[in-house]
């Protein structure tokens, strides 16, 4: 049985080094999909590069933890910027859900302005769309707009409440991440999904060339290792040998 594999590179628009890495991993590797941060400092550069890579499916990386929001968010920003204190607000059940709803719609419209089309799917920076308070908002929005959504089903307790017309892959893995990146790790992710019986799988990745922005990230040099693995000719062969075909959320 043939299975669908979506290799999605997060953080398109984060920096020029990130953008170049994603394009390289698409052009000469197995990356088929990416998600863009519309408030990223290099988003215009990402848009420009994407015009020469029509095969790259582009979704939206909803941002609530970095940079400036597109709308007024006094309940979530500090000194006008977003940050990781969103976790504390979530634990205190103090998230400004109306502000988040408005920001989601604004980022979505901005994506369409930038790329000239709808995103193929939605996910989020630091997986904040999987917060129990935020997930219903994003799931409903994706269903209404007719676009797919990344769903990590492991922390999801209300899977039965998903909109009937919401599209997603059967499986999702964030395991291709960290200091032990290798071809063997990527293939183990596929084998684990096969054992679960997933007919479609998204694997998250972050391939990049190192620049000054990436150097400031807590996750820096492994991005370059990811790029090396994702452009390996032997990996592409091993994926096909396991019965997977590369695709995007347009195939879900």
Curated annotation (Swiss-Prot):
<keyword id="KW-0119">Carbohydrate metabolism</keyword>
<keyword id="KW-0624">Polysaccharide degradation</keyword>
<feature type="binding site">
    <location>
        <position position="61"/>
    </location>
    <ligand>
        <name>Mg(2+)</name>
    </ligand>
</feature>
<keyword id="KW-0460">Magnesium</keyword>
<feature type="binding site">
    <location>
        <position position="125"/>
    </location>
    <ligand>
        <name>Mg(2+)</name>
    </ligand>
</feature>
<protein>
    <recommendedName>
        <fullName>Chitooligosaccharide deacetylase</fullName>
        <ecNumber>3.5.1.105</ecNumber>
    </recommendedName>
</protein>
<comment type="similarity">
    <text>Belongs to the YdjC deacetylase family. ChbG subfamily.</text>
</comment>
<dbReference type="GO" id="GO:0000272">
    <property type="term" value="P:polysaccharide catabolic process"/>
</dbReference>
<dbReference type="GO" id="GO:0046872">
    <property type="term" value="F:metal ion binding"/>
</dbReference>
<keyword id="KW-0146">Chitin degradation</keyword>
<dbReference type="InterPro" id="IPR011330">
    <property type="entry name" value="Glyco_hydro/deAcase_b/a-brl"/>
</dbReference>
<dbReference type="GO" id="GO:0019213">
    <property type="term" value="F:deacetylase activity"/>
</dbReference>
<keyword id="KW-0479">Metal-binding</keyword>
<comment type="pathway">
    <text>Glycan degradation; chitin degradation.</text>
</comment>
<comment type="subunit">
    <text>Homodimer.</text>
</comment>
<keyword id="KW-0963">Cytoplasm</keyword>
<dbReference type="Pfam" id="PF04794">
    <property type="entry name" value="YdjC"/>
</dbReference>
<dbReference type="GO" id="GO:0052777">
    <property type="term" value="P:diacetylchitobiose catabolic process"/>
</dbReference>
<comment type="function">
    <text>Involved in the degradation of chitin. ChbG is essential for growth on the acetylated chitooligosaccharides chitobiose and chitotriose but is dispensable for growth on cellobiose and chitosan dimer, the deacetylated form of chitobiose. Deacetylation of chitobiose-6-P and chitotriose-6-P is necessary for both the activation of the chb promoter by the regulatory protein ChbR and the hydrolysis of phosphorylated beta-glucosides by the phospho-beta-glucosidase ChbF.</text>
</comment>
<dbReference type="GO" id="GO:0005737">
    <property type="term" value="C:cytoplasm"/>
</dbReference>
<dbReference type="GO" id="GO:0036311">
    <property type="term" value="F:chitin disaccharide deacetylase activity"/>
</dbReference>
<dbReference type="InterPro" id="IPR006879">
    <property type="entry name" value="YdjC-like"/>
</dbReference>
<dbReference type="GO" id="GO:0006032">
    <property type="term" value="P:chitin catabolic process"/>
</dbReference>
<dbReference type="InterPro" id="IPR022948">
    <property type="entry name" value="COD_ChbG_bac"/>
</dbReference>
<keyword id="KW-0378">Hydrolase</keyword>
